[in-house]
Swiss-Prot record:
Location(s) in or outside the cell: Cytoplasm
Gene: khpA
The name this protein goes by in its record: RNA-binding protein KhpA
Lineage: Bacteria, Bacillati, Bacillota, Bacilli, Bacillales
GO annotations of cellular component type: cytoplasm
Keywords: Cell shape, Cell wall biogenesis/degradation, Chaperone, Cytoplasm, RNA-binding
Assembly mode: Forms a complex with KhpB.
């Protein structure tokens, strides 16, 4: 899951070296935190949050296939 988020985020941003993804598994669900360069935050969130929503949809679909629950947070 981490590599999926990392790969998509790196394709979206101008500063791919500043993309950081961390995973925390509490047994019941997977919590993923995505951090990007401040200049790239708008690209990851998108107009009215559409890009962030699409990214979450892809991650949720991948998690569903693995019968997992996942939460994706974009942090600054």
């Amino acid at each position: 899951m981490k590599t999926l988020v990392e790969h998509i985020a790196m394709a979206l941003v101008d500063h791919p070296d500043d993309v950081r993804v961390s995973e925390h598994d509490d047994g019941h669900s997977l919590h993923i935190e995505l951090s990007v360069h401040p200049d790239d935050m708008g690209k990851v969130i998108g107009k009215q949050g559409r890009t962030a929503k699409a990214l979450r949809s892809v991650v949720y679909a991948a998690a569903t296939k693995q019968k997992r629950r996942v939460r994706l947070d974009i942090i600054d």
